[in-house]
């Protein structure tokens, strides 16, 4: 019988290492249902992230511009703890929280450099969902 290494239920805790990154990228994915803000270093390693659901909004309130603002502020605050000062913004998706998230990154104290729209557009790929009839 192999010897037990850890007590039952004990988890191995991984410490967060303090990275010191002055310049990075902010990726804002804004869908119709949620907004996700990820702040990475220039190579793409995630330093901090937040989403409207992670900040505490549920259901249809996740898709509001205010929820996107709160998520961007939360991610910016965490990134500033790692020494982040300047970001280039990449926005993806058709959601309502795009502009609000960019403004709140600036308001949180991050200097916004370039803003780029990287929304994927199909070259007539999959059939889109049917139109809503209300």
Swiss-Prot record:
One family name in Pfam for this protein: Ribosomal_S11
Annotated GO MF terms: rRNA binding; structural constituent of ribosome
InterPro entries membership: Ribosomal_uS11 (IPR001971), Ribosomal_uS11_bac-type (IPR019981), Ribosomal_uS11_CS (IPR018102), Ribosomal_uS11_sf (IPR036967)
Gene Ontology terms: cellular component: ribonucleoprotein complex; ribosome
Entry's Gene Ontology BP terms: translation
UniProt keyword terms in alphabetical order: Ribonucleoprotein, Ribosomal protein, RNA-binding, rRNA-binding
Quaternary organization: Part of the 30S ribosomal subunit. Interacts with proteins S7 and S18. Binds to IF-3.
NCBIfam families reported in the protein's UniProt record: PRK05309.1, uS11_bact
Function: Located on the platform of the 30S subunit, it bridges several disparate RNA helices of the 16S rRNA. Forms part of the Shine-Dalgarno cleft in the 70S ribosome.
Family (UniProt): Belongs to the universal ribosomal protein uS11 family.
Name the UniProt record assigns to this protein: Small ribosomal subunit protein uS11
Gene: rpsK
């Amino acid at each position: 019988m192999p010897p037990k290494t850890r007590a039952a239920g004990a988890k191995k805790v991984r410490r967060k290492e303090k990275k010191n990154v002055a310049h990075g990228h902010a990726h804002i994915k804004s869908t119709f249902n949620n907004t996700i803000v990820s702040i990475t270093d220039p190579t793409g390693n995630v330093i901090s992230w937040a989403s409207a659901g992670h900040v505490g909004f549920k259901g249809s309130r996740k898709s509001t511009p205010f929820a996107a603002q709160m998520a961007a502020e939360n991610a910016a605050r965490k990134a500033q703890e790692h020494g982040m000062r300047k970001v280039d913004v990449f926005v993806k998706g058709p959601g309502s929280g795009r502009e609000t998230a960019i403004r709140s990154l600036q308001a949180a104290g991050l200097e916004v450099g370039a803003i780029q729209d990287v929304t994927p557009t199909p070259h007539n790929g999959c059939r889109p969902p049917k139109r809503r009839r209300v």
